[in-house]
Amino acid sequence: MLALAGCILLWPNQQTYAAELQKDNYNGWYYENGQAYWYDNGVLARSKEVYDPQTDAWYWFEADGTMARDKDVFIVLNADGTGKWTRYDSDGRMVKGESYKNGAWYYFDLTTGAMAKGFVNLPQSDDPNGKWVYYDPITGKMQYGEQYIDGYWYYFDTATGKMAHGITNIPDNDDAGGKWVYYDSITGRMQYGEQYIDGNRYYFDTVTGKMAHGKYYRDGAYYYYDTVTGIMQYGEQTIDGDEYYFDTETGAMVTGEVERDGRYYYYDDETGAMLGLGEQIVKYAEKFLGTPYTWGGTSPDTGFDCSGFTQYVYSNFGIDLDRTSSAQRRQGEAVDEDDIMPGDLVCYSGHVAIYVGNNQIYHASDPIGYADLSSSYWQQHLIGAGR
């Protein structure tokens, strides 16, 4: 039984006709032929929202006065034809909050009942900040997955519709494992380029937003990002069996000569891979081209003699050679002349040099420089080579 304004009580299944009512002052519900109507001071509500304080609900009455049930209704609110979409349940009550219909979720304002469109923050029992979702600007249906909105990419959980924030893995047509991207922690917009997150540096492709992993070229230099986490790496790194070095501040891959921890290291000018030990020995030795010969000399400041020079060069690589050429000749492993490689010692009677390739030796002559190993003079005095 429904209580009516005006102290008239009607059963919903009663067939009560308008002629039986004092319509001039009648207010409230009226039922006829299974339809519900509403009167205000005897006037039938038509194309009108009505609030019933006793049920604490809003209702909509069509142009013929019948109450809308299980229906979406557009209500014009302004002279320009704009208004709001509303929804009424099977009892005719205006729907408020989340509503699931025909396979889609919708949201209706808790005060006005207006269908939400665009971004909406929904209350969540397990999160005081709620969750941001997105409703289609035309249909009002909750959207899922990647969405391009006003010039920005967003991602909404495929089950809950919740907007993604932070580092997120999303589907990628080119990779069964998906791609890692980053959404701003506040706006949810996809971010690009270098990003500083929780004390670590990452890089996201400037077109696709995909997180960089491994050795990665950008802005004129190579960088290295952890193959799992994507965090930028610094210092010495082993990649596919080769050694590389990445600047400890910028993360950029170094090439050529690098001085660190009191020693010199050499990396390929193109690939950045550390050169083999022999090649590094040659590169370092060539730093002293033109240094004068000094008998007994053991440093660039005083000049070098032959064994002082080789001892100094090899010490940069942790190789401890004896002081004299004859003692150095007895160190290491003997190498046939046909197998000699850059960085090997070439030993003569009373002299020692470094083989640099292409039948060239490099030694403390006066000044330090190159000589032709195949020349008759050096062949005449050659004793052997060692490694």
Predicted regions, residues:
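Short loop segments at secondary-structure junctions
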Residues: D64, A159, F317, N358-Q360
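Extracytoplasmic/periplasmic, Sec-exported soluble proteins
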Residues: P53, D80, D175, G276-L277, ...
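Extracellular adhesion/carbohydrate-binding repeat motifs centered on closely spaced tryptophans
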Residues: M1-Q280
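Catalytic cysteine-centered active-site loop
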Residues: Y284-P342
